[in-house]
């Protein structure tokens, strides 16, 4: 649904001519999506519950409508949109795409922390709109030696903690 994580996946599958790949969008009418889903062997969806309409969450009801389905894959590490027990019962394999972008996400989180702490966006906007801006209003905070709170210490959370500790001697 909606996007490929990377175009190489579609390119490789198209090269084999062994697959009929159908790209669906969640805003398409169900008269277009369900005929494709009902005959599919594989189904790739987002992993965040709030990004996928409920009728496309893979659960027992969904699997009854898609009896040929043998594999479900989610974007990212999670599989909140997939009922693992229902898939097991139906014989459908579940896979996710964990870890591929973990370093990039951890670095992005660190960049956001720096941007917020140093008031970079606010200062940039003021500087562009007002030639007489007072830079003292945008001094920000140093990160060195501070205590950081991280919610969740999975792969990404642990990497953020490592970066904070190594780069800024944060606790």
Positions of predicted regions on the chain:
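Hydrophobic beta-strand scaffold residues
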Residues: 20-23, 94, 171
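Short secondary-structure boundary/capping segments
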Residues: 13, 34, 63, 85, ...
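Rossmann-like dinucleotide/phosphate-binding beta-alpha-beta segment
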Residues: 136-171
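Phosphate/diphosphate ligand-binding glycine-rich loop within oxidoreductases
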Residues: 41-125, 140, 144
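N-terminal glycine-/charge-rich "phosphate-binding" loop or analogous flexible N-terminal tail
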Residues: 1-51
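Short gly/ser/thr-rich secondary-structure transition/capping motifs
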Residues: 22-28, 52-55, 128-136
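Short, structured coil segments at secondary-structure junctions
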Residues: 15-17, 90, 168
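Residues within well-ordered alpha-helices
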Residues: 8-12, 59, 83, 160
